[in-house]
Amino acid sequence: MAILIDTGMPGQLEQIRLTMSEAGVSFDKLKAVILTHQDLDHIGSLPEILNQSNNNIEVYAHAHDKPYIEGTLPLLKTDPNKMSKEQWAALPEQMKFLYKNPPKAKVDQTLEDGQELSYCGGIQIIFTPGHTPGHISLYLKQSKTLVAGDAMVVADGVLQGPVPQTTLDMTTAIHSLERFLDLDIETVICYHGGLCTITEKKQLENLVK
């Protein structure tokens, strides 16, 4: 079986299929999707994945972001009603359509801080709010890999903190990084910037100072 962490923008299903195939993983093996948070570029292709899969895929997310993913509440960062006329006018028509008609899908199971999923030799859920209220990061115990989501980014191969422009609560987001310090991490995967190898804990410690 296979699991997928986040689903990209709307319309990226074929890219997901191709990437899985290149990694030697059939799309037909996909049994679970874990969402790190509610942002459009993380939940975008979820409805397409669920529609195209022959499996009963389980969707996981934190309870704080669940109503936004399910469409009960508008996405916090792309709600047209919260944008100025100037901001709205500057958007391409395609983005206006997406903001007015965001993807939505049912969350089957909500995740809690410290919870462990049995996939991949054990995945520990780390509640890392700030970027969004229900942001989570995932620690794959067997491979000592941290999937940070948007809690951190990688720029020019260097691990950096959350991006202020897209983070709803920067103080909370920085505080959330402290959760990583007690973990034995060898590799960090960030949604923006990709993979970073951790050679010493100072790389993480410097981000919370």
Question: Where is each model-derived feature located?
Answer:
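Divalent-metal (often Zn2+) His-rich catalytic cores of metallo-beta-lactamase-fold enzymes
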Residues: 48, 52-55, 116, 139, ...
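Active-site metal-binding loops of divalent metal-dependent hydrolases
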Residues: 7-9, 38, 63-65, 130-132, ...
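Short glycine-enriched, charge-decorated loop/helix-capping segments at active-site entrances
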Residues: 159-166
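Residue-level marker for buried hydrophobic side chains located in beta-strands
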Residues: 3-5, 34, 59, 145-147, ...
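Conserved beta-strand hairpin/beta-sheet module of binuclear metal-dependent hydrolase folds
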Residues: 1-23, 137-149, 154
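Core dinuclear metal-dependent hydrolase active-site scaffold
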Residues: 110-140
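Histidine-centered catalytic micro-motifs
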Residues: 33-43, 127-135, 189-195
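Active-site HxH/HxHxD metal-binding segment of metal-dependent hydrolases
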Residues: 12-13, 21-109
